[in-house]
């Protein structure tokens, strides 16, 4: 282990930090056409944890990753990262529990990098110290998550040194992270020094677990917001207050919408009780079946900088992001000198309508 292995990650990876465009892509649903020139990083989702080790053993993984690596022929600066975990993914608490378990997990991640010729590791632990997804958790996850990232940083830096990967080619370590109570269960002011950046999931603010409809990815509060409602700007400020450098905050946007049915028919369905969660819809599905179709009307909340759909006949409300809201977020990222943008996921926008809104940059 080199003496500097545990040092803070001082080198935000990729193209210049403010221009990162990080795409999550799901194994088994790689789009037939990908324009790699619009991306800086692809996070392949997901590796899982079995017996404390990170594994990629799903059918078709090797072919999927070969397709993604082949994109480097068109964009040599593109980085392909493996994301470990995801919603409902268990195993993190045990993997992070002891020094030996952390070391074993980190070394298993190195094995994946070698086997599939990858450029880094992303951890999507949803969530340390919380059992909302039905996963195993412990109170000590809070400290252990920091220690796990420290161990991963050590192992990745040692592997970079051993392979002569320098500068922007050093192995990358990132996490996907949330806001509000998430901060109660992690040591954000400590852990950020070990990662190259944080993929801030600035979405899912309203979902199947919330009691009312609302903007699932609103950038700001609006007249319809309660004081306790979440929004992207408040989330960014929470990271900044914890001492996270602006260049390490990558703002996440959803390429899907969330639908609510049986909604109380007031205020065009926004911030209203609902009878049941109707489901998730990819942006492609929204364009093909919902926006301006079947009685759905698009509305724009100027204060929140967010669109939504309302069908008064079926009493269905859908919150989503579109090119207008994403373009505003691109400007938000630029004006605040954040580290770039991330989205979930590439397969939900096969005509690149949303990705193009990111690629065009800020026009104001």
Give, region by region, the residue ranges found by the protein language model.
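Substrate-binding surface in catalytic domains of secreted glycosidases
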Residues: 22, 51-62, 128-288
